[in-house]
Amino acid sequence: MSGRAVSNSQHAQQSFGSGPQLYRDVAELHAVPSPSHGALMDPSHFDDFAFAYQGLPDQPSLVSLADHAHAHASQSPTAFPQHQAMSGLAHNGLPFGALPAGNRSQSMDGSDAPPDRTSPASNALEDSTTDEFGLASRSRADATDLGGKPKEDKADATPAWSELKTKAGKERKRLPLACIACRRKKIRCSGEKPACKHCLRSRIPCVYKVTTRKAAPRTDYMAMLDKRLKRMEERIIKVIPKSDQEVASSVTRAVVKPAIPGTVPSNKPTKKRGAEEAFGPDLEAWAKAPSKPKIDGDDRPSSLQVQEAEENKLQHEGTEALPSKEIQEHLAEVFFDNIYGQSYHLLHKPSYMRKLKNGTLPPVLVLTVCAVAARFTSSPLVNSSGPEFLRGEEWASHARDICTRRYEWPNLTILTCLLILGLHEFGTCQGGRSWALGGQAIRMAFALQLHKDLEYDPSGRTGPKKQLSFIDREIRRRIMWACFLMDRFNSSGTDRPMFIREDTIQIPLPVKEKYFQFDMPAPTEMLDGQVPHPASPNDGQLADARENMGVAAFLIRAIALWGRIITYLSQGGKDLDPNPMWEDESQYVKHLNDVVNLEASLPSSLKYSAENLDVHKTENTASQFLFMHICLQHNILFVSRAAMSARKQQGVHDDFFSEASKRTFSAANQISELLREAEQSRCFVSAPFAGYCAFSSTTVHILGVISGNPNMKPTAEANLTTNVKYLHKMKKYWGMFHWMVENVRTQYRNALDAMRAGANLQDRAAQSSFLQYGDWFNRYPHGLSDAEFMDPATHKRKDSGADGVLEAKPELQSVEEYFSTLPTPQSVEHKDTIRAVGTKRKQSAKKQAGLPTQSGQHLESMQGTDADSVSGAQERRFSGGLGLPSNSYNPLAVSNAQNPAFSTAMSPMSPANMTAFSHHAHTPTFFPPELLAMNFGQGANGNIDPLDRQLVFGGYSLDASTGLGGGQDIMSGLDWDAVASGAHPDGGLQGRRSTAKAGMNGQAAGMADGAGLSGPEASSAWFMPFNMEPPEMGQDPGFNMGGIDPFTGVFGGGGSGLATPNALGGLQQQGP
């Protein structure tokens, strides 16, 4: 106590001389006698004084001491009871301003006065602006009221908490825990227990609140967002079905930052948990739980496992529909002999045949090959009563169902089946199916990345990448090029754009066939001529890329060029060309130069010659070799004929048109030469596009026939004979060629009429419309049906479900529309006859099937057959030949008012009705009801006797007395019977001037250059076999009427040039 008093007095002395006010206070103090320093500090004076807090640090400040010149002055001891009473009041909770009057300070003279500055009570309780020395201040000088450490405590001992160590073992510099009062006032707590200095000074309870939860570490804004995102993800995961959880496993999850070290939560549960504690177990269980049961040790993606499971099913699905092993092997040989390499180079024959014998081929591939090859076989095991092009439909239906169910999982097997099925549907006149299958194949090819030349298998299997062999890489390339060719074939129409762009295919062209068969790697060029992987001579490979390309590579280039020509001529390219086609800068001239340069760029081994053809025969590629050259010539024909439409335009040069005409007729003749060479070499060119090339050549030959040029006409007639014969052969295997043959028939008839009318050949060539190869889609969108032969007037329009979102059509009809829908009188007259014929078809069919082959029995059956049964049998036979129901067609229901589009429909007069659909079966003549209702007289005007007419098919001719004109006949000597049958006529025609002119390459065709046929002997004199049913005798159409063309209702137009049916499907030209 004495030490503190001394120090305090010294502090007072230092502060004493700080201002003039202090001198006045000192004078007053000296005026009052005070006890000595020893008497003041004598402990005897404090016997009855009890301190409330012994360690009160600011105790000296409660006692006013004055000392001047080292002399201590103080109040009398009577002041201490006052201080004790003040302390008691303060301790009892009384306010400091409520002190009693007796406790107030008294003046020195004993009278009441205002509190003096020297009174401790006034300093501490009443005057807050002055201290005990009278100095003005805002607060205590030592700041002890704020809990600060007094200045004299610097020498005190360190607090007890400083002796504690941190968890890291270091000395603690910060207070581990502050009391509640210091926290609220936000001041530093001394940390003593049970009460800190501030609480002791303020005389308030000191409470330390100990919590079990540690303060969460501060996190930044992004960490907070991560936690919120994590909580939202957990809520979403709980809603996701278990079947879809394998997809969620591959989704990137939100990442919560790990906790700061040292802040791991305690074991006691709290209200809020950390991210690791809240989500850790659930996330771990969710990540480890399998979505579906997997095979032990199989860690591949579930989608890949599903695809492989489907591929395993593909190895067995369709087994029940397979034919016998013998038929499978036979049809496989037929496929590689007649289909492989013509249009598509699909499948590797050594691998296919080896797998077929081992039974490791997928059944769907075997069904597809059998379906498309069945049309070309002559085996009795595969033969059916229907037409050839419908033989494999049963196998195709099973393969089609299997393929369409697996469009989600693309693989090379399904892709190959789609391409082959597209070709099959092309032959069965299923335009919609072929178009859809081709589009699906193209999408699947791009999904398998076939348009890229990859070295490793891109199927996505886990594990080490499998390097593709040369055969596998070549198979991938050929499948992609097959998709490219199918796109060009199917998209050659006016309204069907092409899907595959040439620049998207970054793969080389196929190698030669012998290299592919014998596994000999060789580099080839790309479509634009670049060599992606050139080989040096030291690599052991054939270094010349152009010499390594065979027929397949240049066939692809020819079809690609044809696609560009189609785009220019038929799909708007010509309209976008700013230059006219006869200018050198035009796109037309560019395409023309490309056509000529492509043929000139052929290697010496691929140029057309007899020697090269023999070489390709030994390699079994002669048909492909001929097909490639047919396509090259067809490009020249197609692009040259387009120039004829520009003859009447302004500024066209005559040389431009004449050169185009020469190239057109030269290319048409070359196509016929190639077809004739294929027939003589017994190399059947079976590609459907080859038939279209023959059709295009035929349209040019028709113009040559009516040209009147004596040098051009014989060649055109001979080539026309070859083309028509080839088209008749092709329509047995591809159904759409019935339509093309009928179109040729119509064009020929119209050309004859135009020539007799005095039309110019050049005008005729410019006005003639050109059929596109892809137009058959619109002709046969869903196969053959009754609508092909139904009278449009009897067809009632019905609302289709596909038009549900379109505008509602008006239900009212005008008078003209109403009368146009009424049936013709002839159809009403023969309505009962139609019903009677329909009921007798089956009986007639049975009767025909049971006809004996002996002549006597045949004559008896002919005499016992009535007209109705014969007519019914003929109708049934035609409908059955087309693969239709027996009641699908009736020629009597067709009226004379035909649709103009009907002129290209397949007519029962088509010669293929006998040769393609049945053996030695007679087809009915397609006469309108008006003609059948007439009863023509059978006068003695030179017509053949009825008995002879029964035996001589086509023995009806026109007489000079009919008055059908006496003009020159363009096809005067063309014997269409010989054209269709392939027979060579052995003599001239009697009763007229005739000659036998040899065709090109020594093939003779009956021709004559005089007037039209006339006289009774003007028929082909071809006698029917005795197992053939005779024609109907009830309505014998004798052509002895003047000025009447009985075929007007058939061909849709008048004219004297007639084309009548004969035994083998030729056009029997007749005229006056």
Curated annotation (Swiss-Prot):
<dbReference type="Pfam" id="PF04082">
    <property type="entry name" value="Fungal_trans"/>
</dbReference>
<dbReference type="InterPro" id="IPR001138">
    <property type="entry name" value="Zn2Cys6_DnaBD"/>
</dbReference>
<dbReference type="InterPro" id="IPR007219">
    <property type="entry name" value="Transcription_factor_dom_fun"/>
</dbReference>
<dbReference type="GO" id="GO:0006351">
    <property type="term" value="P:DNA-templated transcription"/>
</dbReference>
<dbReference type="GO" id="GO:0000981">
    <property type="term" value="F:DNA-binding transcription factor activity, RNA polymerase II-specific"/>
</dbReference>
<keyword id="KW-0805">Transcription regulation</keyword>
<comment type="function">
    <text>Zn(2)-C6 fungal-type transcription factor that has a role in conidia production and also in plant colonization. Acts as a negative regulator of the production of macroconidia and is required for full virulence and the positive regulation of SIX effectors. In addition, FTF2 is also involved in the regulation of class II hydrophobins FOXG_02746 and FOXG_02748 likely required for plant colonization.</text>
</comment>
<keyword id="KW-0804">Transcription</keyword>
<dbReference type="InterPro" id="IPR050815">
    <property type="entry name" value="TF_fung"/>
</dbReference>
<keyword id="KW-0843">Virulence</keyword>
<dbReference type="GO" id="GO:0005634">
    <property type="term" value="C:nucleus"/>
</dbReference>
<feature type="DNA-binding region" description="Zn(2)-C6 fungal-type">
    <location>
        <begin position="179"/>
        <end position="206"/>
    </location>
</feature>
<keyword id="KW-0479">Metal-binding</keyword>
<keyword id="KW-0238">DNA-binding</keyword>
<dbReference type="Pfam" id="PF00172">
    <property type="entry name" value="Zn_clus"/>
</dbReference>
<keyword id="KW-0539">Nucleus</keyword>
<dbReference type="GO" id="GO:0008270">
    <property type="term" value="F:zinc ion binding"/>
</dbReference>
<protein>
    <recommendedName>
        <fullName>Zn(2)-C6 fungal-type transcription factor FTF2</fullName>
    </recommendedName>
</protein>
<dbReference type="GO" id="GO:0003677">
    <property type="term" value="F:DNA binding"/>
</dbReference>
<dbReference type="InterPro" id="IPR036864">
    <property type="entry name" value="Zn2-C6_fun-type_DNA-bd_sf"/>
</dbReference>
